[in-house]
A protein has these predicted regions:
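Short, well-ordered surface patches within globular domains
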Residues: 82-83
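Extracytoplasmic cell-surface/polysaccharide-interacting catalytic and binding patches
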Residues: 1-74, 88-181, 187-203
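Segments that shape or occlude catalytic/ligand-binding pockets
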Residues: 79
């Protein structure tokens, strides 16, 4: 794994693959398979997180591993200009954070969007991700409906509710907190603190 850029290192960002070696990286914004319908990151984008999240993510992965499960990362550090473009597409702060004068959450590298997967042989095509089968969570990533909220029950199967609870428990073991509005979004320590906007490329 190549080292991160000087800018990333100066900002305290690390590549999640150095923290969770068996993680599956599927950065949706590096493809057109996202709610904007356009590619927002370069194709070789990396999953960067602030070093303060490293221990927690490793702990979460350790909870999943005995079950034959791995963390799947859909988004990590997100540049400010990408956040602006996303809000232009969906200008609703209930679903997309309004860009501001400071970096928080993804823009600070202190939040991640994740699910988990396993090497399950019988897997519906919609949940197939390479050699892995994504857990049934009731919705896809960036689903702008009430079913996507972390503790939703209406329209969410018992299996999906249990899988969400399992993911939350694993992440909580690492001190990471779910955002109630999105089952896939987890915040690390200090995610809500005002910080200078980073000018760090994701590749």
């Amino acid at each position: 794994m190549p080292p991160v850029s000087e800018a990333a290192r100066a900002a305290g960002l690390v590549d999640v693959r150095g923290v969770v070696p068996d993680a599956a990286i599927d950065l949706r914004y590096a493809t057109a398979n996202n709610f904007t319908g356009t590619q927002l990151y370069p194709p070789r984008a990396r999953c960067l997180v602030h070093e303060s999240m490293a221990e927690g993510l490793a702990a979460a992965a350790a909870v999943l591993r005995p079950h034959g499960q791995v963390l799947v990362f859909w988004d990590c550090y997100r540049p400010h200009d990408v956040q602006v473009r996303m809000f232009d597409v969906v200008p609703n702060p209930a679903w997309v954070a309004r860009p501001g004068k400071y970096a928080h959450s993804h823009e600070a590298g202190r939040s991640v969007d994740v699910t988990f997967a396993s090497a399950q042989r019988q897997c519906p095509s919609v949940r197939r991700s390479g050699e892995l089968c994504l857990a049934d969570m009731g919705t896809d990533f960036d689903d702008f409906s009430s079913r996507a909220t972390a503790f939703a029950t209406q329209g969410v199967s018992a299996e999906a509710q249990a899988n969400r609870a399992h993911l939350r428990a694993a992440m909580q073991a690492g001190g990471l907190t779910v955002y109630s509005g999105e089952w896939w979004h987890f915040d690390g320590p200090g995610a809500g603190v005002d910080r200078p906007i980073l000018e760090v490329p994701v590749d």
